[in-house]
From Swiss-Prot:
Record-given protein name: N-acetyl-gamma-glutamyl-phosphate reductase
Listed SMART domains: Semialdhyde_dh
Keyword Zinc: no
InterPro entries reported for this sequence: AGPR_type-1, NAD(P)-bd_dom_sf, NAGSA_dehydrogenase, Semialdehyde_DH_NAD-bd
Annotated compartments: Cytoplasm
HAMAP family registered for this protein in UniProt: ArgC_type1
GO biological process, one term: L-arginine biosynthetic process
Length: 342
């Protein structure tokens, strides 16, 4: 049975990535696309690379008839999703790609996002969408909150190590490099080619990045006590991709073994042989995560390197993986695409 899909916010990068992936999904059909500022336009006018697809024209959200929609992806900006989702039919399954429902604690949300949550009841209802760790909850959910792309990368490297008890919880450092598409499609001076090309810089440093809220929430939940990591992201002049260097105190072989055992049966998680390190070029355009482990020159320390595509596994691909579960499908359906290389 083919499921009818609506994509709200289809004129942004994550919306376009959803369209690209769903276009070849055997059990999903796009029946509605929204882009309020581009309503009435064809997707080919907004994204010429989608020209060959037979897609509905962009509409305003209030113009969409949701009575025939089985699931909606909400790829709207942060803070916008709250009001929009609150106005959607209560029986509609929703995967939200914004930050609006990732944090369960209203006080934590206000701390990291600077204002009270506008839909606290939905915040309580939402299930955190890190698929490999919340499958059962996602299957039963009506509303799933997509993870932050940086938060997902760090968690794939660290969660199994906390679960296995093989690292010091008080000494975790995440040094992360992210592609520019993670900043969205809107025009920003610091994202102009001349400003970004041939350089890289740290941003939201000193414990100010909002994805720290997700790390705090998830790692503390696993450990059963507060866990705070040090995390600094860097913007790099590549379109797609995230690479996280994670420094931990723990036996390198035990770290590698914990990751290998945890992800042994996972379709999209690949732990490389000990000593081999992954590259963003090897996962570009795919839903795969590659993880490598090496020992440090300091005895009893290890470095874990994780890479994923921020637009795919870090956002739209994982959203589809979650939607598959919510719709009773094989979670990997439509997502077994080989990475794009070179």
């Amino acid at each position: 049975m083919v499921q009818n899909i609506a994509i709200l916010g289809a004129s942004g990068y994550t919306g376009a990535e959803l369209v690209r992936l769903i276009a070849t999904h055997p059990s999903m059909r796009i029946v509605a696309l929204s882009g309020d500022r581009k309503a009435g336009m064809a997707m080919a006018e907004v994204f010429p690379f989608l020209r060959h697809l037979d897609l509905p024209r962009l509409q305003k959200i209030e113009e969409i008839d949701f009575s025939s929609v089985d699931l909606a992806f909400c790829a709207l900006p942060h803070a916008t999703s709250q009001a929009v989702i609150a106005g959607l039919p209560r029986d509609l399954k929703i995967v939200d790609l914004s930050a609006d429902f990732r944090l369960r604690d209203p006080a934590a949300y206000e701390t990291w996002y600077g204002k009270p949550h506008a839909a606290p009841e939905l915040q309580k209802e939402a299930v955190y969408g890190l698929t490999e760790f919340y499958r059962d909850e996602i299957r039963a959910a009506r509303l799933v909150a997509g993870t932050g792309c940086n938060a997902a990368t760090g968690q794939y490297a660290i969660r199994p190590l906390i679960e296995a008890g093989v690292i010091d919880l008080d000494d975790i450092l995440i040094d992360l490099k992210a592609g520019v598409s993670g900043a969205g499609r809107s025009l920003k001076e610091n994202l102009l080619h001349a400003e970004l090309s041939e350089g890289t810089h740290a941003y939201s440093a000193g414990g100010r990045h909002r994805h720290l809220g997700e790390f705090d929430q998830e790692f503390s939940k696993i450990a059963g006590r507060p866990v705070q990591v040090r995390f600094t992201p860097h913007l790099t002049p590549m379109n797609r991709g995230i690479l996280a260097n994670v420094y931990v105190k723990g036996d390198p072989q035990a770290v590698h073994r914990a990751l290998t055992e945890r992800y042994l049966t996972e379709t999209f998680l690949e732990v490389l042989p000990f000593g081999a390190l992954p590259s963003t070029r090897d996962i570009r355009g795919s839903n795969y995560v590659h993880i490598g482990v090496i020992g440090d020159r300091v005895p009893g320390c290890a470095m874990v390197v994780a890479v994923l595509d921020n637009l795919c596994k870090g956002s739209s691909g994982q959203a589809i993986q979650n939607a598959n579960l919510m719709l009773g499908l094989d979670e990997a359906e439509g997502l077994r695409l080989a990475p794009v290389f070179p």
